[in-house]
Amino acid sequence: MHVAPTTELKALLRLAGPLIASQLAHMLMVLTDTLMMARISPQALAGGGLGAASYSFVSIFCLGVIAAVGTLVAIRKGANDIEGATRLAQNGLWLAWALALFAALVLWNLEPVLLLFGQKPENVASAAEFLTLLPLALPGYLTFMALRGFTSALGRSTPVMVISLFGTVLNYLFNVALIEGMFGLPKLGLMGIGLVTAVVSMGMATALALYIRWHPAYTAYPLRKGLSRPSLAALRELWRLGLPIGGTYMVEVGLFAFAALCMGVLGSTELAAHQIALQIVSTAFMVPTGLSYAVTMRVGLYYGAGNLLAARSAGRVGIGFGAMIMFAFATLFLLLPEALVGLFIDRNDPAFAAIFQVAVQLLMVAAWFELFDGMQTIAMGSIRGLKDAKTTFLIGLVCYWLVGAPSAWLFTFTLGGGAVGIWWGLALGLACAAVALTFGFEWRMKRLLGKAGVRTEAAVSA
């Protein structure tokens, strides 16, 4: 059965709006932690930044694996398999806890690895201090993300937004209290920032769990019943889909880490400009990220129900609408780059004049960069809704590391393109991914429709 594009767009926006807001809230939490590090000392900012980068790199893989929960629950819900959806959500929690333990052990033993990679001992010491309590945030964070996937798959993403916004406010207040030693609390420095993140993450997970436990909308999905008995079959299904998603997240994060290293080779001015421009681009990127999650749920819902025409329509609507939104951001970057960079640094300050100019140049490239990045992440979400993450991983690996990274190196160091050359290389890799993933979604749909040709034709003629 076909679904009108306007009808699908309304349903998509109802689901995506709160998810976008929750993404922005999470970004604000990260920004708050960075600002708090700067309030302690320059050394705390450098070492804490190293620890935060290490935490992000490890946790992003876990986050990708847990993303499978929402996809598979949506497919089961579409198939009206309530018991199967419940079982997958329960085992998603077990998987989240196992990943949290594994990631925490890695982070607690990361100090020798950082030293091996040539990091300054004083920065490694500060990073180790930050990572003393920060890994305790992982059980709460991954539990929250698993439950977020579950409730979003049921079409209820508003509680995720509300809890995320409250968590952002509490994160700021608790950080200030521990850094300033207010209300008789000790000044815990970097360790305190990690502690606050852990407490807030656990609080957010608890709040969402209690909401799901008490709200009547979830009565048909008793997560507590049978939670103590994990299913190996369900865990394997989650792992098979989640592993390539986690791998895709890591190769994309790795591409941007490569870009930062290239900027560092060029100099401090280029690296600082890169960080400012990337902060602006990352904020805008929260919109297609939220849309991508929502598109995955919508496509998965129809795919599980066997309504392949509606699944194709949901993917196309998401990709098309995402392209329109990112075109608007691209126009903004082209028309107002100075104003956007001026939100971060003063163009009239001689100390920042060179950084300002480079950041403006990067933002002009980001107009194309952002358009392609938005399209590729939504197309990726569409394919995952069809229970296929291997295709997205392979396309991402090829486009990011066989096109994007070599192009960035070629444009910068061989052709002398400087910082702008790195971003043109990234844009080329993302453009390759956007085209390949969009065609990949259409190819997957064509194959599925071909296999179900008799039923589909019957449904259309009816």
UniProtKB/Swiss-Prot annotation:
Belongs to the multi antimicrobial extrusion (MATE) (TC 2.A.66.1) family. One of its GO terms (biological process) is monoatomic ion transport. The keyword Transmembrane helix applies. CDD domains: MATE_NorM_like. GO terms for cellular component: plasma membrane. GO terms for molecular function: antiporter activity; xenobiotic transmembrane transporter activity. PANTHER family: FMN_FAD EXPORTER YEEO-RELATED, MULTIDRUG RESISTANCE PROTEIN NORM-RELATED. This is Probable multidrug resistance protein NorM. Multidrug efflux pump. It is a multi-pass membrane protein. It is found in: Cell inner membrane. It comes from Pseudomonas putida (strain ATCC 47054 / DSM 6125 / CFBP 8728 / NCIMB 11950 / KT2440). The chain crosses the membrane at residues 12-31, 51-73, 93-115, 125-147, 160-179, 189-211, 238-260, 275-297, 318-340, 350-372, 393-415, 419-441. Keywords: Antiport, Cell inner membrane, Cell membrane, Ion transport, Membrane, Transmembrane, Transmembrane helix, Transport. It comes from the Bacteria. It holds the Pfam family MatE.
